[in-house]
Design a protein with these regions (language model features):
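Von Willebrand factor
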Residues: 1-29, 33-68, 70, 105, 110-111
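Charged helix-capping and loop-helix junction motifs
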Residues: 83-89
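Acidic, Ser/Thr-rich peripheral helices and adjacent loops at domain boundaries
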Residues: 24-43, 118-126, 130
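Short acidic, S/G/P-rich loop/turn micro-motifs used as interaction or catalytic elements
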Residues: 19, 77-80, 106-107
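Von Willebrand factor type A / integrin I
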Residues: 89-150
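DG-centered beta-turn motif at the end of beta-strands
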Residues: 1, 68-79, 124
Length: 150
């Protein structure tokens, strides 16, 4: 969560089937305690990306503009729920960048309950990211891009 040290106005969210803001949790607690608290808040049910996207539309869309980078970390597995890809399209139209980092290999995108092939067209960047080293290098590249354009 040290990304917040590099980027102003960083807000963090978690979800399984509803969006929960966790920005203050990570700012006020040690990482292990913050993760435990977030897991309690979001519960352990199956993920519902469609409902989460509807939550983003209802709660955050007004705050998203051409200065906003939306960064999503997740596998896009929706447990057969409605994809709500039209919300991804709205994010794509409003935000400076929409970036999706997916832990699954690209060859899995669109298989089974994966909605990644529906979401990817509305991402400026969509890529496989399945290790801490990969995440660090991806975020470093994003921060360099952010610093260069700030």
């Amino acid at each position: 969560h040290s990304l917040g040290e590099q980027v102003s106005d960083l807000r963090s969210f978690a979800f399984t089937n509803h969006l929960v803001e966790v920005s203050d949790t990570f700012e006020s607690l040690p990482v292990e305690q913050a993760v435990d608290k977030v897991m309690q808040a979001v519960g352990g049910s199956g993920t519902d990306y469609g409902q989460t996207l509807l939550d983003i539309e209802a709660q955050l869309l007004e705050d998203i503009d051409r200065r906003t980078t939306v960064l999503i970390l997740g596998d896009a597995r929706n447990n057969r729920g409605q994809a709500q890809a039209q919300v991804m399209q709205l994010l794509y139209q409003r935000a400076r960048r929409v970036i999706w980092l997916n832990p699954e290999p690209v060859s899995f995108w669109g298989l089974g309950d994966s909605e990644m092939k529906r979401y990817a067209p509305y991402c400026h960047i969509a890529r496989e990211c399945n290790s801490l080293a990969h995440l660090e290098s991806t975020l470093d590249a994003l921060l360099r891009t952010h610093s260069a354009s700030a």
